[in-house]
Amino acid sequence: MTAILERRESTSLWGRFCNWITSTENRLYIGWFGVLMIPTLLTATSVFIIAFIAAPPVDIDGIREPVSGSLLYGNNIISGAIIPTSAAIGLHFYPIWEAASVDEWLYNGGPYELIVLHFLLGVACYMGREWELSFRLGMRPWIAVAYSAPVAAATAVFLIYPIGQGSFSDGMPLGISGTFNFMIVFQAEHNILMHPFHMLGVAGVFGGSLFSAMHGSLVTSSLIRETTENESANEGYKFGQEEETYNIVAAHGYFGRLIFQYASFNNSRSLHFLLAAWPVVGIWFTALGISTMAFNLNGFNFNQSVVDSQGRVINTWADIINRANLGMEVMHERNAHNFPLDLAAVEAPSTNG
């Protein structure tokens, strides 16, 4: 009998680190994208928590009228927010070392830019990490593709829109009421409700919710019975069992009779493709809509489009929305300008004398 002894090659520290980073045996997969994701998301989360609790007021409009957003300065969970970086900073990269002092950095809303840029980098890396893990497990890449929809939406709101408007002060505040304020002002300035891409996004989100509820309820209801008629069907199953617990043919038959035959799927892959693609495509369109409106390619304007034979305007719903938009535009940034931009753009009549 011949024994062959091979000398085991010693792996370098870097090699062991690489193997650990890319190992799919870890409880949580790290991956090369995770190397960047972990510090960026930890930074964004830490600064968000600290700033939400204790950040001083921020001069958001650049007119020396600071706005308070933190809990220690009089806000609650609903009204609190990370106030966007000052209009005085605009789109300038504004790290701590660019300010004369930390107080100046806080006054100009530096934490907002820090949080947003780290957050966007972190979620982009999370998407890459999803692809990386799928690749190493021999899976297809569609999980990362689906996640690209919320990543695109966040990027549109926090980065593309401020770029188009010329200042990070136009970005969405990081808080509950700040989000609603952003939505109201966005409608006032861009008429987003009349934008086709927003309509597609609404159809995607609401339709996706409906399809998800229908699918979950059908799967839960169409069980493969393992018990007699005198026992509960639930008694025939154990939570987490490997055996299939529902019958897609039964679900197909039920739904086909409930609506019509071709409204239901008898192919599981086709069904789940629709469940994934519908909301993802809708949110893609919403992100695209935000990105186009960032550069003032706004929603449809049908103001005063219906007139009678005498030329008098017959108000439509579009005119009602327009008046609401003007009212909302008047209310926001009330000390930064005296009139809505739509009215301020009109030339004043010339006077002789």
Swiss-Prot record:
Binding sites annotated in the UniProt record for Fe cation: H215, H272
Record flagged with keyword Amino-acid biosynthesis: no
Residues the record lists as N-acetylthreonine modifications: T2
GO terms assigned for molecular function: chlorophyll binding; electron transporter, transferring electrons within the cyclic electron transport pathway of photosynthesis activity; iron ion binding; oxidoreductase activity, acting on diphenols and related substances as donors, oxygen as acceptor; oxygen evolving activity
Bilayer-spanning residue ranges: 29-46, 118-133, 142-156, 197-218, 274-288
Compartment(s): Plastid, Chloroplast thylakoid membrane
Record's GO cellular component terms: chloroplast thylakoid membrane; photosystem II
Site (Tyrosine radical intermediate) location in chain: Y161
PTM: Tyr-161 forms a radical intermediate that is referred to as redox-active TyrZ, YZ or Y-Z. C-terminally processed by CTPA; processing is essential to allow assembly of the oxygen-evolving complex and thus photosynthetic growth.
Intrachain S-S bonds: none
Top-rank taxon: Eukaryota
Listed InterPro entries: D1/D2, Photo_II_D1/D2_sf, Photo_RC_L/M, Photo_RC_L/M_CS, PSII_D1
Entry keyword Cell wall biogenesis/degradation: no
Membrane topology recorded in Swiss-Prot or TrEMBL: Multi-pass membrane protein
Annotated chlorophyll a ChlzD1 binding sites: H118
Positions bound to pheophytin a: Y126
E.C. designation(s): 1.10.3.9
Reactions it catalyzes: 2 a plastoquinone + 4 hnu + 2 H2O = 2 a plastoquinol + O2
BP terms from Gene Ontology: photosynthetic electron transport in photosystem II; response to herbicide
Residues where chlorophyll a PD1 binds: H198
Family: Belongs to the reaction center PufL/M/PsbA/D family.
Record's function text: Photosystem II (PSII) is a light-driven water:plastoquinone oxidoreductase that uses light energy to abstract electrons from H(2)O, generating O(2) and a proton gradient subsequently used for ATP formation. It consists of a core antenna complex that captures photons, and an electron transfer chain that converts photonic excitation into a charge separation. The D1/D2 (PsbA/PsbD) reaction center heterodimer binds P680, the primary electron donor of PSII as well as several subsequent electron acceptors.
Name recorded for this polypeptide: Photosystem II protein D1
Organism: Dioscorea elephantipes (Elephant's foot yam)
